[in-house]
């Protein structure tokens, strides 16, 4: 066998290109391995290739959802994120009209909002009022104002605690009440959450003032769980405003020590002297001039207004209906979500306003104020009546006096040498303060003269009486004389009537 010995020759240009390609290839592999991503995944991430989706069109009764598409976007209103709007209701007929007024003015696309109501343990016409308001909302001519899917559930949980402010917020009722409310929330959330929901929003029905952009305002923070600050208005005599929701807080050393000292089934509730936790509360962090975008990390949260990504509930977080780390319901939901490495955030300067509900003491004070108002009105009415009587019975002569004063006071001007004659007597008695010679007599001299005249008259009367009694000299009379003179015309008898 013969071999042809040929000398191999390489084109320098070819070698240069090959070297460049090899260098690029190895560098690319090095970069991709550093970021633990394959070339195929990189191309897919850039949108050139779409993930594999099986085709179930020809398979009846099969629905396919890729849950990667429902993670919750911070601009969900632009991405078409659907929101599950959960509302627990109990004896809420008087609050539903206000609630639907807020609902109808929300700026989040209504067709992306699915409403889910749970009516439980109600004794009023909550269901009837709910149906009538839903009919009005869904019959609007502007179809963009109509909401998406609407579900109504009815289930009682044996709630026997009253709905008054004092009943619901009494210390002794807090533990059992929170656990029952947690059961209701879990029941509603478990049956209402659908695979296509990206967000879940919990709202109390008795919120009085809330921004129409509440969904967008909370959503754009892109947090797993987020709540606003909640305050309430008060009457003037109670201070105008007050923090309402104290269930949103950050853990403190005092809270941990208190939890360690309590029984396993105990439930810590905020705002009561029995449980002093010294925790920083979201409500008290509010600054009226603060930035509404400011965030505060929380451990426990309140349930008035909660926006959470649907994945939080899908992965197992819920509202514990038992004592979880000595808390229950929404506060325990916050702690549980933190344990699952979800971020829980509050907005201290972004405020919504709960309605004012008077306590038993407030109602007593309001009754006293009503009675006091009646008393003041009656007192004012009587005062006006007596003022009218005074005006009628007593003539105001001040204007007349101002007119006559000058003409009266001119008589005391000594330069005029006026001889003044003043009649100090009562009108018509005929006496004057001028003597028989026409000279002026002072009131004191006149009084002395009158006394002398009276004494003279008395003496004359005594003399006349003495003359009539037969004693012109004024000699004192004994008893016999008095008896004799008592009957001067007595005639003596000629016989003695005592003799027989």
UniProtKB/Swiss-Prot annotation:
Keyword Transmembrane helix included in the entry's annotation: yes
Chain ranges on the Cytoplasmic side, renumbered to this chain: 1-15
Assembly and interaction partners: Component of the M-Pol II complex composed of ANP1, MNN9, MNN10, MNN11 and HOC1.
Signal peptide limits: none
Lineage, top ranks: Eukaryota, Fungi, Dikarya, Ascomycota, Saccharomycotina
Ranges of Low complexity composition bias in the record: 446-467
Annotated GO CC locations: endoplasmic reticulum membrane; Golgi cis cisterna; mannan polymerase complex
GO molecular function, one term: alpha-1,6-mannosyltransferase activity
Designated name of the protein: Mannan polymerase II complex ANP1 subunit
Listed GO biological process terms: cell wall mannoprotein biosynthetic process; protein N-linked glycosylation
InterPro entries according to UniProt: Mannan_Polymerase_Subunit, Nucleotide-diphossugar_trans
Lumenal topological domain: 28-500
Gene that produces this protein: ANP1
Residue spans crossing the bilayer: 16-27
Keywords, sorted A to Z: Endoplasmic reticulum, Golgi apparatus, Membrane, Signal-anchor, Transmembrane, Transmembrane helix
Organism: Saccharomyces cerevisiae (strain ATCC 204508 / S288c) (Baker's yeast)
Biological function: Involved in the organization of the secretory pathway. Required to maintain a functional Golgi apparatus.
Pfam family, one: Anp1
């Amino acid at each position: 066998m013969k071999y042809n010995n040929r000398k191999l020759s390489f084109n320098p240009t070819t070698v240069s290109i090959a070297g460049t390609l090899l260098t690029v290839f190895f560098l690319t592999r090095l970069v991709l391995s550093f970021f633990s991503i394959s070339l195929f995944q990189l191309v897919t991430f850039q949108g050139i290739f779409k993930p594999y989706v099986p085709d179930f069109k020809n398979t009846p009764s099969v629905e396919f959802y890729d849950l990667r598409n429902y993670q919750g976007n911070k601009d969900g209103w632009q991405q078409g994120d659907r929101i599950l709007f959960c509302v627990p209701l109990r004896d809420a007929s008087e609050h539903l009209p206000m609630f639907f007024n807020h609902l109808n003015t929300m700026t989040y696309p209504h067709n992306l909002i699915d409403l889910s109501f749970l009516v439980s343990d109600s004794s009023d016409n909550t269901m009837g009022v709910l149906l009538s308001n839903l009919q009005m909302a869904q019959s609007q001519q502007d179809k963009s104002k109509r909401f998406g899917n609407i579900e109504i559930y009815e289930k009682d949980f044996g709630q026997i605690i009253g709905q008054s402010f004092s009943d619901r917020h009494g210390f002794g009722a807090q533990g059992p009440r929170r656990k029952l409310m947690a059961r209701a929330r879990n029941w509603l959330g478990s049956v209402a959450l659908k695979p296509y929901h990206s967000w879940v929003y919990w709202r109390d029905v008795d919120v009085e003032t809330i921004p129409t952009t509440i969904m967008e305002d909370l959503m754009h923070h892109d947090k797993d769980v987020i709540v606003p600050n909640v305050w309430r208005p008060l009457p003037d005599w109670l201070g105008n405003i007050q923090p309402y929701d104290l269930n949103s807080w950050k853990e403190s050393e005092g809270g941990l020590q208190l939890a360690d000292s309590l029984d396993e089934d105990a439930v810590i509730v905020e705002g009561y002297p029995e449980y002093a936790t010294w925790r920083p509360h979201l409500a008290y962090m509010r600054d009226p001039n603060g930035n509404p975008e400011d965030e505060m990390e929380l451990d426990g949260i309140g349930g008035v207004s909660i926006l959470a990504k649907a994945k939080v509930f899908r992965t197992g977080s819920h509202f514990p209906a038992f004592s979880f780390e000595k808390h229950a319901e929404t506060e325990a939901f916050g702690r549980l979500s933190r344990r699952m490495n979800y971020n829980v955030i509050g907005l201290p300067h972004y405020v919504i306003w709960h309605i004012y509900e008077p306590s038993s003491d407030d109602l007593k004070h309001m009754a006293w104020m009503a009675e006091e108002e009646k008393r003041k009105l009656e007192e004012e009415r009587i005062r006006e009546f007596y003022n009218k009587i005074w005006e009628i019975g007593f003539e105001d002569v001040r204007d007349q006096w101002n007119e006559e004063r000058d003409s009266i006071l001119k008589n005391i001007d000594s330069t005029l040498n006026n001889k003044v004659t003043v009649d100090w007597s009562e009108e018509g008695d005929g006496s004057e303060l001028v003597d028989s010679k026409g000279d002026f007599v002072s009131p004191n001299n006149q009084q002395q003269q009158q006394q002398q005249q009276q004494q003279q008259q008395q003496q004359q009367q005594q003399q006349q009486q003495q003359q009539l009694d037969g004693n012109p000299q004024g000699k004192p009379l004994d008893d016999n004389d008095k008896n004799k003179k008592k009957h001067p015309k007595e005639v003596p008898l000629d016989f003695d009537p005592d003799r027989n």
